[in-house]
């Protein structure tokens, strides 16, 4: 991941002083230390969503890691209005809140890739799914058959029309 020069700089150590009652206080030495998280059009998805979009090479390394651990990769996709957890697109069994991340379902691209040992197979399926649904969110999830749980999930494609994402430099005000 390549960060901008501004992001790569370490933050200055804040100056610690004691107030009249003996409590430690800090004084922000730079404006960057007092920034506020941008709550609008700054949505995140699962693992790695705080990073800039992953390159094909970075996705390939993640796929290799998944296969090295004998996990089962699976592609899922969703339209932009169905991708985020919300009251409109969640399946409920009674009065359940929609804040739990798995309380919504994405459409599975084909079947999970059971027994897949070649990362290029996964990458070609990502390309095929992207070609078929260019304006959909596409994520790669992986499952551990021994523990019977989802291990990880991350976006491999964000639609070009998406306006709900901010670059790391624009995430704070």
Curated annotation (Swiss-Prot):
- Compartments, record wording: Plastid, Chloroplast
| Key words of the record | Calvin cycle, Carbon dioxide fixation, Chloroplast, Lyase, Monooxygenase, Oxidoreductase, Photorespiration, Photosynthesis, Plastid, Transit peptide
What domain of life does the native source organism fall in?
A: Eukaryota
User: Which residues are the transit peptide here?
Assistant: 1-33
Give the CC-aspect GO terms: chloroplast
- Gene Ontology MF terms in the entry: lyase activity; monooxygenase activity
One biological process term in Gene Ontology: reductive pentose-phosphate cycle
- Pfam families according to UniProt: RuBisCO_small
What SUPFAM superfamilies does UniProt report for this protein, alphabetically?
RuBisCO, small subunit (SSF55239)
Primary site of residence: plastid
Q: What is known about what this protein does?
A: RuBisCO catalyzes two reactions: the carboxylation of D-ribulose 1,5-bisphosphate, the primary event in carbon dioxide fixation, as well as the oxidative fragmentation of the pentose substrate. Both reactions occur simultaneously and in competition at the same active site. Although the small subunit is not catalytic it is essential for maximal activity.
Matching entries from PANTHER family are given as: RIBULOSE BISPHOSPHATE CARBOXYLASE SMALL CHAIN 1, CHLOROPLASTIC, RIBULOSE BISPHOSPHATE CARBOXYLASE SMALL SUBUNIT, CHLOROPLASTIC 1
Family named by the database record: Belongs to the RuBisCO small chain family.
The remark listed among the other comments is: The basic functional RuBisCO is composed of a large chain homodimer in a 'head-to-tail' conformation. In form I RuBisCO this homodimer is arranged in a barrel-like tetramer with the small subunits forming a tetrameric 'cap' on each end of the 'barrel'.
Quaternary structure and partners: Heterohexadecamer of 8 large and 8 small subunits.
Q: Under what name is this protein listed?
A: Ribulose bisphosphate carboxylase small subunit, chloroplastic 2
Instruction: Say which species the protein is native to.
Output: Acetabularia acetabulum
For this protein's source organism, the top of the classification is: Eukaryota, Viridiplantae, Chlorophyta, Ulvophyceae, TCBD clade
